[in-house]
């Protein structure tokens, strides 16, 4: 019996998972999303074209692979339709290569309104959601009031009506306007018809059956481990488990059937929206990282906050996920820096710690180690033998600090700009 390999981000998202899953998929038969929704996007460059995938697994560009939207995902039929139709116009017909779990929850039009209403009600305490209705959908799921993909097959109208009325009562209590709901709802209902073109499956049986028959499965996470609802920088987190454990609950896979865990991180660190960020830079260096790394959200377009790499946070997420292989992205962004800093510890209340704290507050001061930069372009490097000495030293330093080997290094956005190390 085969095991599921897992690919996930180790920081606050935007690590480059889309590109790497596209690199890895030739080795797998099935690519499956296990959590999250359209609030996070994977940017891929394929045959010179740039694509942003929000709900659809990144294996969609690889021939006859089966792509699965798992039960842990929350799905907006309207945004899914827009995404799928855009891919179809580019020559990528999904209907024969994408299946959807019946147990995946649906993001309703009123969930979007609830998202906005809840943020407005928080005033200065808002956490900066993307407004896609993710949180309210997971709230309904946990409170056992959710609408699932499988409900589209029978009893949908009544279940939808009951959920909608409940949402409207909440919106009215918050004095939030619903004048735009009718138009959104009409388009959403039309999109559910489009959704029915795809095969609905009991994905837990599909995945486990595939493993039993010797097929290889890659589970693809969204966002990053530091946004995990339990272990992230709460309350500035997402509404699902983004760590490896989320693969088990989001696909129906037993823990003993998890194989390699690929942990992706950038050679620096970024964050979108509100929330603590100990190594954030507010100077020209931060602006330079943003410019060179093109750090703007693939879904929201928001400028990402940038800072030096945080090894305290990385050690924490490596531990949580049981990472077996590391993948370093955007090494080329660091090409021009004469000195590179890495946070190796935090100072809190005058005491130094290497552990990730309960609260990431303003009282956390990063303790840095400085390393010499390589100050030459990495974008045309094709093998580890061509690495500058300073870059090889940087990798060796990271591996010693993190306790896991770096198996893959990315030196540019294209698939070809990926170096598989012989370590």
Curated annotation (Swiss-Prot):
CDD domains: AdSS. GO terms for molecular function: adenylosuccinate synthase activity; GTP binding; magnesium ion binding. Gene3D superfamilies: Adenylosuccinate Synthetase, subunit A, domain 1, Adenylosuccinate Synthetase, subunit A, domain 2, Adenylosuccinate Synthetase, subunit A, domain 3. Keywords: Cytoplasm, GTP-binding, Ligase, Magnesium, Metal-binding, Nucleotide-binding, Purine biosynthesis. This is Adenylosuccinate synthetase. Transmembrane segments: none annotated. Its cofactor is Mg(2+). GO terms for cellular component: cytoplasm. Its EC number is 6.3.4.4. Binds 1 Mg(2+) ion per subunit. Belongs to the adenylosuccinate synthetase family. It catalyses: IMP + L-aspartate + GTP = N(6)-(1,2-dicarboxyethyl)-AMP + GDP + phosphate + 2 H(+). The lineage of its organism: Bacteria, Pseudomonadati, Bacteroidota, Bacteroidia, Bacteroidales. The active site is at residues 14, 42. GTP binds at residues 13-19, 41-43, 304, 410-412. InterPro entries: Adenylosuccin_syn_GTP-bd, Adenylosuccin_syn_Lys_AS, Adenylosuccinate_synth_dom1, Adenylosuccinate_synth_dom2, Adenylosuccinate_synth_dom3, Adenylosuccinate_synthetase, P-loop_NTPase. PANTHER family: ADENYLOSUCCINATE SYNTHETASE. HAMAP family: Adenylosucc_synth (MF_00011). PROSITE patterns: ADENYLOSUCCIN_SYN_1, ADENYLOSUCCIN_SYN_2. IMP binds at residues 14-17, 39-42, 130, 144, 223, 238, 302. Pathway: Purine metabolism; AMP biosynthesis via de novo pathway; AMP from IMP: step 1/2. Substrate binds at residues 298-304. It is an enzyme of class 6 (ligase). The keyword GTP-binding applies. Homodimer. One of its GO terms (biological process) is IMP metabolic process.
């Amino acid at each position: 019996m085969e095991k599921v390999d897992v690919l996930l981000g180790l920081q606050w998202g935007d690590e480059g998972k889309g590109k790497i899953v596209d690199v890895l998929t030739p080795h797998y038969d099935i690519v499956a999303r296990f959590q999250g929704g359209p609030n996070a996007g994977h940017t891929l460059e394929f045959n010179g074209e740039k694509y942003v995938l929000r709900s659809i697994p990144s294996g969609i560009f690889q021939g006859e692979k089966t792509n699965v939207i798992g039960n842990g995902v929350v799905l907006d039929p309207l945004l899914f339709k827009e995404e799928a139709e855009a891919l179809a116009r580019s020559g990528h017909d999904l209907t024969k290569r994408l299946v959807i779990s019946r147990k995946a929850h649906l993001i309703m039009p009123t969930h979007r309104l609830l998202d906005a209403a809840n943020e407005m009600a928080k005033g200065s305490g808002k956490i900066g959601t993307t407004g896609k209705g993710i949180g309210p959908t997971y709230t309904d799921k946990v409170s056992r009031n959710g609408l699932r993909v499988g409900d589209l097959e029978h009893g949908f109208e009544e279940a939808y009506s009951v959920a909608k009325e409940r949402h409207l009562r909440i919106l009215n209590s918050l004095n939030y306007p619903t004048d735009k709901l009718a138009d959104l709802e009409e388009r959403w209902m039309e999109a559910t018809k489009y959704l029915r073109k795809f095969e609905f499956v009991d994905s837990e049986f599909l995945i486990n059956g595939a493993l039993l028959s010797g097929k290889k499965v890659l589970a693809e996470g969204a966002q990053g481990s530091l946004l995990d609802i339990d272990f992230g920088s709460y309350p500035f987190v997402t509404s699902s488990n983004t760590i490896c454990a989320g693969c088990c609950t989001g696909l129906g896979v037993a823990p003993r059937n998890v194989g390699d865990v690929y942990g992706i991180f950038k050679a620096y660190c970024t964050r979108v929206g509100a929330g603590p960020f100990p190594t954030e830079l507010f100077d020209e260096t931060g602006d330079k990282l943003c410019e060179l790394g093109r750090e703007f959200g693939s879904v929201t377009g928001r400028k990402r906050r940038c800072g030096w790499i945080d090894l305290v946070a990385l050690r924490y997420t490596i531990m949580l996920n049981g990472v077996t292989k590391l993948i370093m992205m955007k090494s080329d962004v660091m090409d021009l820096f004469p000195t590179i800093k890495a946070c190796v510890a935090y100072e809190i209340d005058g005491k130094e710690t290497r552990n990730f704290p309960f609260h990431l507050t303003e009282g956390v001061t990063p303790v840095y180690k400085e390393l010499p930069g390589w100050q030459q372009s990495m974008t045309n490097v094709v093998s580890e033998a061509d690495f500058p000495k300073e870059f090889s030293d940087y990798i060796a330093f990271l591996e010693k600090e993190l306790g896991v080997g770096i198996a893959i290094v990315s030196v540019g956005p294209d698939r070809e700009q990926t170096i598989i190390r012989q370590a």
